[in-house]
């Protein structure tokens, strides 16, 4: 029997069929090799968009810098970065006029945050450029290294633990004539192995002191390391992203705090909220535009796309915005906030690893590091690379490139949103002073513009005016990639609006399935994804039930844990059958131990262990939830964990799931190969750091855990806490007298050791 596919949709409103257009089934593309070429592309493009600006030389670093601000206005539709200071300031003034007190209040909120933020705020985030080692590191390690170097150079304000005091050290460090740092290096020796009598290469890790003069230090402090953005779908070419170092991070954080506070108060801003809250906020703006348009008026919506948003933004413009926003505030506050844009105006982009060369016969390979690009003969490169290098040479200093104009990806998302909204704000009739008016939505570089006018000419005029107003502040709406529709149908930040936002369930498809963390987490994440999609994405009960069955099937194949009474033979089936036969209450076995699946769409919110606890044999309970089980490198788990799920589009999302610690919550061991490299010292530091933090959390369970303020160190805080807890436990009879005495003795020993040190 033939089925006509159109019949499937007879009862379905057209907008609900969006999930059937899903193109992203396979793995997303990842980048290999170096990002050097992509970074050079970014730098060259950025300079091209601002080429009519003024060239200057930075007196401290000697870097050549291009300043396009207040440059000539473009005469064509090509993207350009010539923002006009007075236009930006005026847009800010009108934004404030429409929202009385918005800047004032946001400044007060930010000042409060600045007073309270601790320096460990900077340990959040993934890879960070570590200027002491000149490469990327996890954020916590990079921060620890920076503080260690600061202290050994006599900068000690950071010891208070407040972020603002750490930033005082950063400012002071820039005035120092030299900074002494410790770097890791490795020595290789050929030695004979006693056992096998073969020659082996032995690596030893050394640390050596190195002095950086003021110029070298400034270059490192202003450096953004670059990498290639991975897993981007729908693009032919990869592109570069940047990670700033610890000197810049803190200042950026405070600027973004201020901008976030402003965005929260702007109804057109798609940041900082997300999910359903964002949809509600946006639906409001659309509703407002549709209800306010008189019956005779036309209303059109542009699904907007901006050309090279980051590369045409300018830190100098952000400085002007901050200067205006904070104009009646105390001097110290204005200074703290203006440092980030000033540093970005003088930023250097690190070119990454450099180029790899292979000989024709593929026998020889050699790496040309970025530092050599200034002097190497260009005959070895192909035409396009040669052009790139020629363009970039005047800007090169020690393997970094001077990049004054432009903002690298994702640095000032909130502040650039404020700029975008300020242009949307100018669409009110009292500002356009004519028959057309506009409003819209802005979220970083993505926008939707709603224009109302009595006739088509008016709509066209409104769009033109918006386009030209944007040009004045360095925003380039792409005429090729933006399209216009009757209001009621548009797309914004991958939300599709058609008389209300349409659930695009297919976006979530890549996050269904088995994550591959461990048996316990995978089960929990799998059912949570299904539950969340029933709540947020119109996943109906029948489809959810099907998704659940498919997930269980997938899970059993992944972990080879088919039911104990199945005929399927796998490596594990022998053991699982034995367990099945020994178990009295078979319903109590976890799926990963060959048990049956008890999940249905009504109980997805219950962790599997809790769901089956009452059904388990007693000895099975004892084995499963036993922290002393010697065969398991056991991981303690907070009651809620975070998993990273990948939707098809947009950034990886963090999703909470319930975690019950069982013997299935194992962690795979770290790959050995890292232990032989110069990373090893860093790894050990990191583990020590981790252990200290874990220990500390033991003493201060998160409910009662306030970071020790004042001078007491972590150790002192833990010792005093141990004494208090021990006394309470002793007096209430929870511990014996001998145990109490032993705890007190250990505490005294620790204090004694500290005094000796």
From Swiss-Prot:
Subcellular location field: Host nucleus; Host cytoplasm
Positions of region (Disordered): 56-78
GO molecular function, one term: RNA binding
One CC-aspect GO term: host cell nucleus
Post-translational modification, as annotated: Phosphorylated by host PRKCA.
UniProt EC number: 2.7.7.48
InterPro entries: RNA-dir_pol_NSvirus, RNA_pol_PB1_influenza
GO biological process: DNA-templated transcription; symbiont-mediated suppression of host gene expression; symbiont-mediated suppression of host mRNA transcription via inhibition of RNA polymerase II activity; viral RNA genome replication; viral transcription
Catalytic activity: RNA(n) + a ribonucleoside 5'-triphosphate = RNA(n+1) + diphosphate
Keyword presence, Transferase: yes
Name this polypeptide is given: RNA-directed RNA polymerase catalytic subunit
């Amino acid at each position: 029997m033939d089925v006509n596919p159109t019949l499937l949709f007879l009862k379905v409103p057209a907008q609900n069929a969006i999930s059937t257009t899903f193109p992203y089934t396979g793995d997303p593309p990842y980048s290999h090799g170096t990002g050097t070429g992509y970074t050079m592309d970014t730098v060259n493009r950025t300079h091209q968009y601002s080429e009519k600006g003024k060239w200057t030389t930075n007196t401290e670093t000697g870097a050549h810098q291009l300043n396009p601000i207040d440059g000539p206005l473009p005469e064509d539709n090509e993207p350009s970065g010539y923002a006009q200071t007075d236009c930006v300031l005026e847009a800010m003034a009108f934004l404030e006029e429409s929202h009385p007190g918005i800047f004032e209040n946001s400044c007060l909120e930010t000042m409060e945050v600045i007073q309270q933020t601790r320096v460990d705020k900077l340990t959040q985030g993934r890879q960070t450029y570590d200027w002491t080692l000149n490469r990327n590191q996890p954020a916590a390690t990079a921060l620890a290294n920076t503080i260690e170097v600061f202290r050994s150079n006599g900068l000690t304000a950071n010891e208070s633990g407040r972020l603002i005091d750490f930033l005082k050290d950063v400012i002071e460090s820039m005035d120092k004539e030299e900074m002494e740092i410790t770097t890791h290096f490795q020595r290789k020796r050929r030695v004979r192995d006693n056992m096998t009598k073969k020659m082996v290469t032995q690596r030893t890790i050394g640390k050596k002191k190195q002095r950086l003069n003021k110029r070298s230090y400034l270059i490192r402090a202003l450096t953004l390391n670059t990498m290639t953005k991975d897993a981007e779908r729908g693009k032919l070419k990869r592109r570069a992203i940047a990670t700033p170092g610890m000197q810049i991070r803190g200042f950026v954080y405070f600027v973004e705090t201020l901008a976030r506070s402003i965005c929260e108060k702007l109804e057109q801003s798609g940041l900082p909220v997300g999910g359903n809250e964002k949809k509600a906020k946006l639906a409001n703006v659309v509703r407002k535009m549709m209800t306010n348009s008189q019956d005779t008026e036309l209303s059109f919506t542009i699904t907007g796309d901006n050309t090279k948003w980051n590369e045409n933004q300018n830190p100098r413009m952000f400085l002007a915005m901050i200067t205006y926003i904070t104009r009646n505030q105390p001097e110290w506050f204005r200074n703290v906030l203006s440092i980030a844009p000033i540093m970005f105006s003088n930023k250097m982009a690190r070119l990454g690893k450099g180029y790899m060369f292979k000989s024709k016969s593929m026998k020889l390979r050699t790496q040309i590091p970025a530092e050599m690009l200034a002097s190497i003969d260009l005959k070895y490169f192909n035409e396009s690379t040669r052009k790139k290098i020629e363009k970039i040479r005047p800007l090169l200093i020690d393997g970094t490139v001077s990049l004054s104009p432009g903002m690298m990806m994702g640095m000032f998302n909130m502040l650039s949103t404020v700029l975008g909204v300020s242009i949307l704000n100018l669409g009110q009739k009292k500002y356009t002073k004519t028959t057309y008016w506009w409003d819209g939505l802005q979220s970083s570089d993505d926008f939707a513009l709603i224009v109302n006018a009595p006739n088509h000419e008016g709509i066209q005029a409104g769009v033109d005016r918006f386009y030209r107003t944007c040009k004045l502040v360095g925003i380039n709406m792409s005429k090729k990639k933006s399209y216009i529709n009757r209001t009621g149908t548009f797309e914004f930040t991958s939300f599709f609006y058609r008389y209300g936002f349409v659930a695009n369930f297919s976006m979530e498809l890549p996050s269904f399935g088995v994550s591959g963390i461990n048996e316990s987490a995978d089960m929990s994440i799998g059912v949570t994804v299904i539950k969340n999609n029933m709540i947020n994405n119109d996943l109906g009960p029948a489809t959810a039930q099907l998704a659940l069955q498919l997930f269980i099937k997938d899970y059993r194949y992944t972990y080879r844990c088919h039911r104990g009474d199945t005929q399927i033979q796998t490596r594990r089936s022998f053991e699982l059958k034995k367990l099945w036969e020994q178990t009295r209450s078979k319903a109590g076995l976890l799926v990963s131990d060959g048990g049956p699946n008890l999940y249905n769409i009504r109980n997805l919110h219950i962790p599997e262990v809790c769901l089956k606890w009452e059904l388990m044999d007693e000895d099975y309970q004892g084995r499963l939830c036993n922290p002393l089980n010697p065969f398991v490198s056991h991981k303690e788990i907070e009651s809620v964990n975070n998993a990273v799920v990948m939707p098809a589009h947009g950034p990886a999302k963090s999703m909470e799931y319930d975690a019950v610690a069982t013997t299935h919550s194992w962690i795979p061991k770290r790959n050995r190969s890292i232990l032989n490299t110069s990373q090893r010292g860093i790894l050990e530091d990191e583990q020590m750091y981790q252990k200290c933090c874990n220990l500390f959390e033991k003493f201060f369970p998160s409910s009662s855990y306030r970071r020790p303020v004042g001078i007491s160190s972590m150790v002192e805080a833990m010792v005093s806490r141990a004494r208090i807890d021990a006394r309470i436990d002793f007096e209430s009879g929870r511990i014996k007298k001998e145990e109490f005495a032993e705890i007190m003795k250990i505490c005294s020993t620790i204090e004694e050791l500290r005094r000796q040190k």
